[in-house]
Amino acid sequence: MCGNNMSAPMPAVVPAARKATAAVIFLHGLGDTGHGWAEAFAGIKSPHIKYICPHAPVMPVTLNMNMAMPSWFDIVGLSPDSQEDESGIKQAAETVKALIDQEVKNGIPSNRIILGGFSQGGALSLYTALTTQQKLAGVTALSCWLPLRASFSQGPINSANRDISVLQCHGDCDPLVPLMFGSLTVERLKALINPANVTFKIYEGMMHSSCQQEMMDVKHFIDKLLPPID
């Protein structure tokens, strides 16, 4: 089962307090699990929204001397010209699309689903949103980058999400994924989707982590895009 997505445990879920009419699927960063993010969303939840925080499968990661840890795909390096795990990224995106499909089967239309993630998970959420034919409500991309950026056209994408709303957040003291990566990603996104729908927020003094103000901004973004419908 090594490296097989079926080996990952069931996601951590913050259920809706009443009938769920919208969902947030949020992907954690390298070496983490969904539990901490589920706790964070429990603190900013809205009663009609279900929050799903899946756990990545455990796999050897080249960046960390091939040690096995939860990872959505292999990471070779953190410089702009590092080789990327193309097949792993694409396979992981299919896993996320299957999670979206599952919620659609549960009665939540894809345009009432926000995809998001932190660091490696944020990178995967951006890549999935830009390549899927499932029309999504938005993406919250925290402290991350756009993977396989050379695979995208120079002009706007021809997919379901060319008008998608994106909230991208980054700390200005991030030592792992420098703020420059976030800035370059925002510029790339503005060429691929409607630039009016891309918001970039920078948090002073924040490292490769989250903060209370960022979570409030995430809550505002989610609640604005996924209002109650009953």
From Swiss-Prot:
Broadest EC class assigned to this enzyme? hydrolase
- Give residues where N6-acetyllysine occurs: K224
Classify the source by domain of life: Eukaryota
The record's listing under InterPro entries reads:
AB_hydrolase_fold, LYPA1-2/EST-like, PLipase/COase/thioEstase
What Gene Ontology cellular-component terms does the record carry? cytosol; endoplasmic reticulum; mitochondrion; nuclear membrane; nucleoplasm; plasma membrane
Enzyme Commission number(s) of this protein = 3.1.2.-, 3.1.2.22
The record ties this protein, via Pfam families, to: Abhydrolase_2 (PF02230)
- Active site annotated at which positions? S119 (charge relay system), D174 (charge relay system), H208 (charge relay system)
| One GO-annotated biological process of the protein | negative regulation of Golgi to plasma membrane protein transport
Q: What's the main place this protein lives? A: cytoplasm
Substrates-to-products reaction catalysed:
S-hexadecanoyl-L-cysteinyl-[protein] + H2O = L-cysteinyl-[protein] + hexadecanoate + H(+); 1-hexadecanoyl-sn-glycero-3-phosphocholine + H2O = sn-glycerol 3-phosphocholine + hexadecanoate + H(+); a 1-(9Z-octadecenoyl)-2-acyl-sn-glycero-3-phosphocholine + H2O = a 2-acyl-sn-glycero-3-phosphocholine + (9Z)-octadecenoate + H(+)
Documented effect of changing D174A: Abolishes lysophospholipase activity
Q: Assembly state and interactors?
A: Homodimer.
Say which family it is in.
Belongs to the AB hydrolase superfamily. AB hydrolase 2 family.
**Role of this protein:** Acts as an acyl-protein thioesterase. Hydrolyzes fatty acids from S-acylated cysteine residues in proteins such as trimeric G alpha proteins or HRAS. Acts as a palmitoyl thioesterase that catalyzes depalmitoylation of proteins, such as ADRB2, KCNMA1 and SQSTM1. Acts as a negative regulator of autophagy by mediating palmitoylation of SQSTM1, decreasing affinity between SQSTM1 and ATG8 proteins and recruitment of ubiquitinated cargo proteins to autophagosomes. Acts as a lysophospholipase and hydrolyzes lysophosphatidylcholine (lyso-PC).
Protein name from the UniProt record: Acyl-protein thioesterase 1
